[in-house]
Structures are given as C-alpha cells and as structure tokens.
C-alpha cells in the first residue's frame, strides 16, 4: 500500500513539474529574456570598467581592505570568468588603472555610467515581475548609490571573514583537515547562490517569498557553474574566435560570456516570478473544480421510477370498464 501511495505521489509531482515547465515556457516567450540579456550585456560592457574602478576605489578607502585587492581580483576572475579569460583580466586591470588617473569630472562620469547599469538591471527584473508600482527617484537613487558603495565593502568583508575562518586552528586539525579544501571549493557556488538570492529578494519592487527566490537562485547558480565550465571547454577545444579575430578575440569572447551570464540571471528571475503564478493558477483550478461539485450536489433530484407509469395506466384501464354498465342502464331508461 505504501509503495502505491509513493508511486502516486511521485506521478503527481512529475505531472506538476511538467505543467510548471509548460507555464515557464510561456513565461519565457512573453518576457523575451534574450532581448533583455542583449541589452544588459551591452550596458555591462560599457559599465564594466567604471564598476570595477569604483569598486576598487571604495575598497582602497578602507585601510583594512588595502591588502586584499589581489585576492578579490583573483577570486572574481577565477570563479566568475572562464579560464580562457586571462587576457580579459590583463586588459581590464589596465583600463581600471587608466580610469583611476582621471579627473574628478571623469570619475563622476564613471559613477554615472555605473549607476546606469544598476538602473537597467532594476528595470529589467521589475518588468519580469510585472510590477506596476515604481519607486520614486529619491528611493531609486539611494538604493543604487547604496549598492555602488556598500556592495564592494560587503564583498571585501565577506572575503576577509572567510579567510579568517579558514585560517582558524579548528580547521587545521587532523580530523578537519579535509574540511578546508572542501569549503574553499564550494565557496564560489555558495557565493553565487547568496548573490542570486539577494538579487531576487531585494531588486523586485514587490513581495517575493524566500523559498521561490531560493529555488531560482539555486537553479541560476547551477547553470552558471555548468555554463562557465562549458564555455571554457568550448573556447579551448574550438578556438573559433581566436582564429577569426586574432588579437581582438577578447572582445567577442567577453561579450558572449556576459550575454550568457545575463541569460542565466534572467532565467532564474523568471523561475522565481513564475512560481507563485503557477501555484495561484493551480489553486484556482482546484477551487473551480470544488465549486462545480457543490453546484451539482445542490441540484434537486427530479428522477422518477418508470415502473409507476404502468400502474397508473392499469388504474385508468380498471376505471373505464366500471363506467360501461352505468352508461348502458342510462340508455335503457331513456328508451323506455
């Protein structure tokens, strides 16, 4: 009996997943995330150097973060850019060094471009959630500025805290000696999940449930890891861009990877936004079905037995012969 129940539950779960995939396919067709990802990739390439320059300048403002710039760069380039992007790291570092030598007006322009990227991300994600209420200019600018200033600080603080925890003597013992490599190996994955979760919870101007955001964040993080490894494998096994573009191959490679990254981010956002819609639709379908059952149960019973008809006919037939003698007696009396 338990096996049958478990099999039924498994079939119900798979059917629900299939229906959700159909709903997700319709949602992806409506949102057109490929077009949005292209727009965000273009804005990201324009804002990449300003964002990195502002991030490094914010970290350099705090003495505690002065010695970890190299660690942050290595962490970002090794875990969020495919292994074939070593030349990308060199070029970006040169661009950032050149940007940091600019005047105050140039630095302000870089910050404006960086804020434009955050604004584009905000608008794209809110359009996926179909939010009708928009934030005011003051609130939007305050949020963008907070992300631009506090984001690098929080990232640096998390790396410092992780380095401190890993260096504790507790993890250096013989019993826990294998925990440190495992923790360091899983750190980029956990950081990706936390980043996607924060984006899906904070950026939309509507209420998002934690479980829905966590599901979208996990899917996006897994796809990001697989996409990074697959993209690196493609670049190493099939060096098409290097054969065509030569020394300029870094530009299309970087653009393609940024485009794929935004596709993954928007896909996780669509999953998070489509989950409550699917559950509400499923709940309304169940309520409609229950309502139809109640209406059917309230219809009065107008059925009758067919066997009653012959009895009535037999009664009529039995009454007709009883009237014949009376009619004959009346006729005889009239004749007399």
Swiss-Prot record:
Biased composition (Low complexity): 307-323
Protein source organism: Shewanella woodyi (strain ATCC 51908 / MS32)
Localization: Cell inner membrane
Membrane topology: Multi-pass membrane protein
Main location: membrane
InterPro entries in the cross-refs: UPF0761_bac (IPR023679), Virul_fac_BrkB (IPR017039)
HAMAP family for the chain: UPF0761
GO cellular component assignments: plasma membrane
Keyword set, alphabetical order: Cell inner membrane, Cell membrane, Membrane, Transmembrane, Transmembrane helix
One matching Pfam family: Virul_fac_BrkB
UniProt biased composition (Basic and acidic residues): 325-336
Keyword Transmembrane helix appears in the UniProt entry: yes
Region (Disordered): 307-336
This protein's name: UPF0761 membrane protein Swoo_4618
Family in the record: Belongs to the UPF0761 family.
Transmembrane regions: 45-65, 102-122, 137-157, 179-199, 213-233, 251-271
């Amino acid at each position: 009996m338990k096996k049958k129940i478990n099999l039924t539950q498994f079939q119900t779960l798979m059917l629900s997943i299939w229906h959700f995939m159909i709903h997700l396919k319709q949602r992806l067709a409506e949102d057109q995330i490929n077009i949005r990802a292209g727009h965000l990739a273009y804005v990201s390439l324009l804002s990449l150097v300003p964002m990195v320059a502002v991030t490094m300048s914010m970290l350099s403002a705090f003495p505690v973060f002065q010695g970890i710039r190299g660690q942050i760069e290595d962490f970002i380039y090794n875990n969020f850019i495919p292994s074939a992007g070593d030349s990308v790291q060199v070029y970006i570092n040169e661009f950032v060094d050149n940007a940091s030598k600019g005047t105050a007006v140039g630095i302000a322009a870089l910050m404006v471009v960086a804020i434009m990227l955050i604004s584009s991300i905000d608008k794209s994600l809110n359009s996926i959630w179909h939010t009708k209420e928009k934030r005011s200019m003051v609130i939007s600018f305050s949020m963008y500025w907070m992300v631009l200033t506090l984001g690098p600080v929080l990232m640096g603080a998390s790396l410092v805290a992780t380095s401190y925890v890993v260096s504790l003597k507790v993890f250096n013992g013989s019993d826990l000696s294998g925990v440190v490599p495992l923790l360091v190996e899983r750190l980029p994955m956990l950081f990706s999940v936390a980043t996607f979760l924060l984006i899906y919870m904070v950026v939309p101007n509507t209420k998002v449930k934690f479980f829905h955001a966590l599901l979208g964040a996990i899917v996006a993080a897994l796809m990001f890891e697989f996409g990074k490894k697959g993209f690196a494998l493609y670049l190493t096994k099939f060096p098409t861009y290097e054969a065509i573009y030569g020394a300029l191959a870094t530009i299309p490679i970087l653009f393609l990877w940024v485009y794929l990254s935004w596709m993954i981010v928007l896909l996780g956002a669509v999953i998070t936004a489509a989950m409550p819609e699917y559950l509400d639709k499923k709940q309304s379908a169940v309520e409609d079905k229950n309502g139809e059952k109640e209406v059917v149960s309230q219809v009065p019973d107008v059925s009758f037995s067919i066997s009653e008809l012959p009895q009535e006919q037999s009664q009529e037939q039995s009454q007709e012969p009883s009237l014949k003698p009376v009619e004959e007696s009346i006729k005889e009396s009239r004749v007399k």
